Design a protein with these regions (language model features):
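Short, small-residue-biased leader/transition segments that mark boundaries at the very start
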Residues: 1-6
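Mechanochemical coupling/switch segment within NTP-driven translocation systems
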Residues: 7-41
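Helicase P-loop NTPase motor core of nucleic-acid translocases
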Residues: 35, 40-62, 132, 138, ...
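Loop/turn-to-beta-strand initiation segments
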Residues: 38-39, 53-56, 70, 80-85
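Conserved ATPase-coupling elements of RecA-like P-loop NTPase cores
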Residues: 50-52, 63-72, 77, 94-97
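Walker B catalytic acidic pair
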Residues: 61, 87-88
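Short regulatory helix/loop adjacent to the ATP-binding pocket of P-loop NTPases
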Residues: 94-112
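Conserved coupling/interface region of RecA-like P-loop/ASCE motor cores
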Residues: 106-146
Length: 146
């Protein structure tokens, strides 16, 4: 009963992740894998104290983590695990004056063996073609090059 209450509260925030899984695997396959706990979707707040061994871990929307949250997440990685962290530093929604853990991680972890960064541009957008044009327009307005 308690678990359902937590799930009911956090599900709206995790909706984009569910949508991506449904698009990739289909509803039934996703549901089956979640019932078997092969796939677990959990808010970052519930990671403290855990060690995730033999797992493929995804932290989505990481631009909105604080430096403390990012460090906590990164130190959950256990043996046999890989982690992928995604985020768009042009879409930070943190309160003014709060630093992004994703930006800090880029600086702190640059050059650390076993860690790699991949950067995408408007050309990598896999949404409606108009979205690519919107991103390019914002980049031009901010003085960025394609």
């Amino acid at each position: 009963q308690r678990q359902m209450c937590i799930r009911d509260r956090v599900d709206p925030y995790l909706r984009p992740l569910y949508d991506a899984l449904f698009d990739l695997l289909g509803f039934e396959k996703t549901r089956t894998l979640m019932e078997r706990q092969t796939i677990e979707i959990a808010p970052l707040a519930y990671m403290r104290g855990r060690t995730l061994n033999n797992a493929f871990i995804i932290l989505d929307e990481a631009q909105n983590t604080t430096p403390e949250q990012m460090k906590m997440f990164l130190t959950r990685i256990g043996f046999g695990s890989k982690a992928v962290i995604t985020g768009d530093i042009t879409q930070i929604d943190l309160p003014r004056g709060t630093h992004s853990g994703l930006i800090q991680a880029q600086h702190v972890l640059a050059g650390v063996r076993g860690i790699a960064f991949t950067y995408f541009t408007a050309a990598d957008v896999v949404r409606h073609p108009l979205v690519m044009k919107i991103i390019r327009a914002y980049d031009r307005a901010e003085g960025k090059k394609d």
